[in-house]
Structures are given as structure tokens and as C-alpha cells.
């Protein structure tokens, strides 16, 4: 019997926290479906979602100012358990009659939490025990405000040296507040605390498992598509691979895979993709040579958003042409949940569009194909788990992500055949050396970027003006935040040496040492 994987659900209201998506991932890891929505979402949407529990995220603002964000008041009146984290705890306390003040000593980083009442959230959880027998927890703090007076009905359930009210609870109404961040890895017991809220307090059944997600996706595809054919674009990345595999598992020969050779793929990627999918998927694969078409469309275009939208437009037009030849009505896309989040606009401005994702905002409004997106609810790590469960090779599953517009957005400014050729070679050298040195799987994504600027250098006995190549490598779990990879200097020196010696047009190589945020992972 198929499980309803969406039956039990948690709603996360986002107050602009850098950790909001991480909260969602943690809830998914517990085995329960959740969605992330802006904190000012309307009442009808929340009631339609019908959550079993609500989590209020942290945020960068202060509750002490009258114009800052508040939780929708009605969520405290519908009988639903609520967990406030950091800012979420503070706004809950303030809105329910407590007091919040600026603290004389802000807490940023590690703190030791002393549990005063372990009921519900902290039951059976401890890192250490105090001499008085009280449970102690290592937690991660990041706040400049504190709850200075509890709302009616609440009691203090934990404290730190600097925060007498580091956790609070109204057990009767099932409202809980945590001043620390249970979602980050720096709070070792955070996963168990969240599980207590989601499973024990909200009474959610953990049906959100890889096996159940696959079963649900297959059923959904079959119900939507019926006997019609689906066309799926292959890129060599894990998202399109898992999408194609899921669709193939659901409808078999009704799937037609199309690989568009845009001229913007990585070195030798077309041959590699064809080999992998024809060998492992067993589906029909059509390769379309669209290099001239893409170059013509991108000629004279420097704006990154325009390049993304043009790439999306051209992809869809190629697919539509193939679909007409084959009488296909459906387009399968590898859109994943972070694509949806980053491309969403919210009334608060807390979810401003950072960049248009090729799989979301790049689609033309007059698209003739119906869209099916089986991965739309999933984070990248969930997609990888699905791929392994579906039997795709690990080398493909753990291949670094590659953007839909390809090298067009790794070339700053206008794209040209010369720039593409230079970038392909530089990128191939970087990836080859990462694999040879066993660093490839230690980083989450790595690539080269072409800068159409010339820098003076010396080759032989002559001055040489050549282009600049930037190398980018990051480590991340969910691609919502990322840290630049601290690769050994000897390794970077070797890569740089190869690039400037093997690619005559390049005179300088630089390494990008910027985290996300403030930067995005891609340069454009």
C-alpha cells in the first residue's frame, strides 16, 4: 500500500534566517515533509497547508523595533504546536505578552545550556551532566536580544550563563522557544531536539523516506502523463539523470531523452553523457546539434539574467521542435527545491530573487509543452539518495552540479567561441587535477571562470597580455550556503602552472575565496 508522504507536514515560517533552509533539511531528515514559506504568508495559505506543527525561524532583525517582522497572530490560536528558534522565540514571547530586550552581552558561538525542565523537547537528551545532576547541552548561539520576561503560561526550561531564559515552554498550548540554533551541526543534539518536536509533540509519522518518495513520484507521473510521451533534457548532471530515471521507471518507452549540444557543455561532455545514459538508462536518447543556434542567440548579450533567459528560451524551443516531431506533450525538468526557493519572490523581501534559475525563471511564458518536475520538492542531498536507490552509478550521482545555461554564465560578459574554447580547457585541467589528487569528492562543486580582461605577464623573454581564469571550489551540504574550499597551495600552484603553460591565451590564474553568502556559488 502506497504511503501518503505529504499527510503529516511541518510548516517553517522564514523571518530571513540564513539557516531557514537548513531547518527544512533537518525536518526532512527526520522523515517528515515540510515546506518553507515567508513569515507574512496569508492565513488562507497556512490553513490550506494544514500543518501538524509550525516552526518559526531565526532572523537578522530585532523584535524591539515596532516595524520588524511578526508571526501571523492566528497561528497561536489554531491549536497547532509552535517552535520558535532564536528570533522566532523572541517574536513568540513578545506577541504573547512577554518582554524582549537588547542584551548587555550578545552570544555568538558555542554556549553550554543547562536544562531546567527536560519535559518534551529535552527528554533524555544530554551531552554532559552538571555536578547538581542537571543535563548540559553544547549549543550554538547567535543573538543580540533576549527574552527578559516570559509570557503568561510559559516557564523557563533551560538557561546559559548569559541567557537566563534560553528556552521556554507553554506545555498546555504546546508552544516552545529555543534561543539557540538546533538546526546547525554545532549543536550536536539538535537533530534529537527537533525530532522530539516533530515526532513526539506534533505526532508526525515519518513517511518521508527515499523509498516512499520514489513510489509517490512514479504514481504521480503515471497519473499526470497517462499514455502520452515525455521528453527529458539531459545535461550530464544528477538532477536531469534522476528525473529521466524516475520518468523511465514510471512510463518506460514513453520517455524520450534529448541531449542538446549547445556548445556550452564541458570538454567531451556530449560523448560522456551519451555513453552513460545509453548504457545505464536504456532509454531512447536523441542528440541535437544546436551550437550555432545558441551562439547566434547569445551574440552581443552581456547581462547574466539575459543570458540565463535566452538559454532557457532556446532549450525549450529545441525541445518543442523535437516534441512536435515525436508528438510529445510533456517536458520533464530537473527543478529542485533550492531552485524554487531562490527564484521565489516574497512580500517581505526576505526571499529576493538572487538569480533566475534556468529550471524556473528561464522558462518562456508561451511554452507549449506541459511541465512535469518530479524533483521539485527535494533538496540536492535527497536527489542523490534517490539516484543511488534507483541504481544510477555513483560517479554520475556525485558529479559536481553544472548550470543549465552551461559555460555561458561562467564567461563574464559576452560569450564567444574563443572564450568557450579557453574555458573548456581550463576547467578540464582543474577537474582532472582535483580527481588525480583525490580532492574532487572532498569539495561539493568546482569549476573555472573566464574573465574577458587581459593582464600582463611574461612568457619566454617577452611581455604577454593574456586572459584571466578564476578557479572556484566550495564545500556545502545543501547549496543554500557554502564555504570556499581551502585547497592546498601546492595543489593550486600546480593547477595554475598547467593552465598558463598549456593554454597560450591565459596569463593569470586567481582563486575565489568568497563564501555563500555573501556571494553566490556561480559568478553569474
Curated annotation (Swiss-Prot):
GO biological process, alphabetically ordered: GMP biosynthetic process
Residue intervals passing through the bilayer: none
Pathway listed: Purine metabolism; GMP biosynthesis; GMP from XMP (L-Gln route): step 1/1
Under PROSITE patterns, the record lists: GATASE_TYPE_1 (PS51273), GMPS_ATP_PPASE (PS51553)
Active-site residues (renumbered): 86 (nucleophile), 181, 183
One GO MF term: ATP binding
Q: Which GO terms describe its cellular component?
A: cytosol
Cross-referenced InterPro entries, in alphabetical order? Class_I_gatase-like, GATASE, GMP_synth_C, GMP_synth_GATase, GMP_synthase, GMPS_ATP_PPase_dom, NAD/GMP_synthase, Rossmann-like_a/b/a_fold
The answer on whether this UniProt entry bears the keyword DNA-binding reads no
Taxonomically, the superkingdom here is: Bacteria
Which residue numbers delimit the Glutamine amidotransferase type-1 domain? 9-207
Which keywords, in A-to-Z order, does the entry hold?
A: ATP-binding, Glutamine amidotransferase, GMP biosynthesis, Ligase, Nucleotide-binding, Purine biosynthesis
State which Enzyme Commission number(s) the record gives: 6.3.5.2
Give the signal peptide, or none.
none
Q: Which residues participate in ATP binding?
A: 235-241
Q: Which residues form the GMPS ATP-PPase domain?
A: 208-399
What does the protein in this record do?
A: Catalyzes the synthesis of GMP from XMP.
The protein's name is GMP synthase [glutamine-hydrolyzing]
Provenance organism: Coxiella burnetii (strain RSA 493 / Nine Mile phase I)
Amino acid at each position: 500500500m502506497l504511503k501518503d508522504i505529504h499527510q503529516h507536514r511541518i510548516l517553517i515560517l522564514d523571518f530571513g534566517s540564513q539557516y531557514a533552509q537548513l531547518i527544512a533539511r533537518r525536518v526532512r531528515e527526520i522523515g517528515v515533509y515540510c515546506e518553507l514559506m515567508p513569515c507574512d504568508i496569508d492565513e488562507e495559505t497556512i490553513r490550506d497547508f494544514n500543518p501538524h506543527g509550525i516552526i518559526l525561524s531565526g532572523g537578522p532583525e530585532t523584535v524591539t523595533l515596532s516595524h520588524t517582522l511578526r508571526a501571523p497572530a492566528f497561528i497561536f490560536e489554531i491549536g497547532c504546536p509552535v517552535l520558535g528558534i532564536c528570533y522566532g522565540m523572541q517574536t513568540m514571547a513578545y506577541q504573547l505578552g512577554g518582554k524582549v530586550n537588547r542584551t548587555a552581552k550578545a552570544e555568538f558561538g558555542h554556549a553550554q545550556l543547562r536544562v531546567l525542565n527536560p519535559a518534551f523537547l529535552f527528554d533524555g537528551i544530554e551531552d554532559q551532566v552538571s555536578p547538581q545532576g542537571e543535563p548540559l547541552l553544547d549549543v550554538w548561539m547567535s543573538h543580540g536580544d533576549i527574552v527578559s520576561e516570559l509570557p503568561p503560561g510559559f516557564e523557563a526550561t533551560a538557561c546559559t550563563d548569559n541567557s537566563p531564559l534560553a528556552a521556554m515552554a507553554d506545555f498546555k498550548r504546546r508552544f516552545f522557544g529555543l534561543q539557540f540554533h538546533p538546526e546547525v551541526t554545532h549543536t550536536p543534539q539538535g537533530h534529537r531536539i527537533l525530532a522530539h518536536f516533530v515526532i513526539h509533540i506534533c505526532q508526525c509519522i515519518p513517511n518521508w523516506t527515499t523509498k516512499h518518495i520514489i513510489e509517490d513520484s512514479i504514481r504521480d507521473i503515471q497519473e499526470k502523463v497517462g499514455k502520452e510521451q515525455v521528453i527529458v533534457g539531459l545535461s550530464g548532471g544528477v538532477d536531469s539523470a534522476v528525473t529521466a530515471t524516475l520518468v523511465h521507471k514510471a512510463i518506460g518507452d514513453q520517455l524520450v531523452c534529448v541531449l542538446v549540444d549547445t556548445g556550452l557543455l564541458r570538454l567531451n561532455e556530449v560523448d560522456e553523457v551519451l555513453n552513460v545514459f545509453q548504457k545505464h538508462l536504456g532509454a531512447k536518447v536523441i542528440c541535437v546539434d544546436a551550437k550555432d543556434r545558441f551562439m547566434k542567440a547569445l551574440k552581443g548579450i552581456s547581462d547574466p539574467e539575459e543570458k540565463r533567459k535566452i538559454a532557457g528560451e532556446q532549450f525549450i524551443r529545441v525541445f518543442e521542435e523535437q516534441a512536435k516531431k515525436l508528438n510529445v506533450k510533456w517536458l520533464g525538468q530537473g527543478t529542485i527545491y533550492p531552485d524554487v526557493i531562490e527564484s521565489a519572490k516574497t512580500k517581505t523581501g526576505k526571499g529576493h530573487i538572487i538569480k533566475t534559475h534556468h529550471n524556473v525563471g528561464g522558462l518562456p511564458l508561451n511554452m507549449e509543452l506541459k511541465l512535469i518536475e518530479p524533483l521539485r520538492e527535494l533538496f540536492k542531498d535527497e536527489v542523490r539518495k534517490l539516484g543511488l536507490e534507483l541504481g544510477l552509478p555513483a560517479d554520475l550521482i556525485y558529479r559536481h552540479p553544472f548550470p543549465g545555461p552551461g559555460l555561458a554564465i561562467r564567461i563574464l560578459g559576452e560569450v564567444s567561441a574563443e572564450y568557450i574554447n579557453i574555458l573548456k580547457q581550463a576547467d578540464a585541467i582543474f577537474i582532472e587535477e582535483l580527481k588525480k589528487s583525490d580532492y574532487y569528492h572532498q569539495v561539493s562543486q568546482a569549476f573555472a571562470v573566464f574573465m574577458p580582461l587581459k593582464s600582463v605577464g611574461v612568457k619566454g623573454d617577452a611581455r604577454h597580455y593574456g586572459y584571466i581564469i578564476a578557479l572556484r571550489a566550495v564545500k556545502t551540504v545543501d547549496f543554500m550556503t557554502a564555504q570556499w574550499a581551502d585547497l592546498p597551495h601546492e595543489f593550486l600552484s600546480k593547477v595554475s602552472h598547467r593552465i598558463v603553460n598549456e593554454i597560450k591565451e591565459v596569463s593569470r590564474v586567481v582563486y575565489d575565496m568568497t563564501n555563500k553568502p555573501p556571494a553566490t556559488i556561480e559568478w553569474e
